[in-house]
Amino acid sequence: MVSIRPCQIGDLMSMQNANLTCLPENYQMKYYLYHFLTWPQTSFVAEDDKGNVVGYVLAKIDENEPKRGHITSLAVLRSQRKLGIATKLMKQAEVALLEVYDADCVSLHVRKSNRAAFSLYHEVLKFKIDEIEKEYYGDKEDAYSMVLYLKPEVEEEKEREKQLEKINKAAKESIEAAKRANEEPKPVSNVIHGKKKNVKKIE
């Protein structure tokens, strides 16, 4: 039986070990400590019936956007996968970000090649692709930047903004295309006022 509970300072070493075992993106201990001290309510661990940490989610609030939560890292030991643990961890983090920090949304990054993780985020947790960030990872692999809106009204507003941005972009491109067409030099013609111009042949 696996239970989900808030992260405690004594869990940080186990979280780091799970990270090193499961993921290519690794962090020094001071990074986990920084998360725990700065956002103590947003990170959770999965614990088995023997008290062992078998998974974790490390979450925070974006320093530049105080209404935007972010999932820094999610890991579940291979022996404990396919049991819904990752989904439970993510749901707990989403609730904490909304209730504690009143976050509008939560974002994350996932490797384009990580189909299992993408399927979890997109199909199960309903995250949407926001953009593709080129060479995001240290090995130059691209990342999907994904977002889940925690408030329906905020999602609707963002969708309206995106549609307006698309309309404005299309209008701008149309205006620029018209300008280029007007600026193109017209072909020189030897017909003047409907009459063929006589061109003197030089012998």
UniProtKB/Swiss-Prot annotation:
<dbReference type="InterPro" id="IPR000182">
    <property type="entry name" value="GNAT_dom"/>
</dbReference>
<feature type="domain" description="N-acetyltransferase">
    <location>
        <begin position="2"/>
        <end position="151"/>
    </location>
</feature>
<feature type="compositionally biased region" description="Basic and acidic residues">
    <location>
        <begin position="177"/>
        <end position="186"/>
    </location>
</feature>
<dbReference type="GO" id="GO:0031415">
    <property type="term" value="C:NatA complex"/>
</dbReference>
<dbReference type="InterPro" id="IPR045047">
    <property type="entry name" value="Ard1-like"/>
</dbReference>
<comment type="function">
    <text>Seems to be involved in N-acetylation.</text>
</comment>
<comment type="similarity">
    <text>Belongs to the acetyltransferase family. ARD1 subfamily.</text>
</comment>
<feature type="region of interest" description="Disordered">
    <location>
        <begin position="177"/>
        <end position="203"/>
    </location>
</feature>
<dbReference type="GO" id="GO:1990189">
    <property type="term" value="F:protein N-terminal-serine acetyltransferase activity"/>
</dbReference>
<keyword id="KW-0808">Transferase</keyword>
<dbReference type="GO" id="GO:1990190">
    <property type="term" value="F:protein-N-terminal-glutamate acetyltransferase activity"/>
</dbReference>
<dbReference type="Pfam" id="PF00583">
    <property type="entry name" value="Acetyltransf_1"/>
</dbReference>
<feature type="compositionally biased region" description="Basic residues">
    <location>
        <begin position="193"/>
        <end position="203"/>
    </location>
</feature>
<protein>
    <recommendedName>
        <fullName>N-terminal acetyltransferase complex ARD1 subunit homolog</fullName>
        <ecNumber>2.3.1.-</ecNumber>
    </recommendedName>
</protein>
<keyword id="KW-0012">Acyltransferase</keyword>
<dbReference type="InterPro" id="IPR016181">
    <property type="entry name" value="Acyl_CoA_acyltransferase"/>
</dbReference>
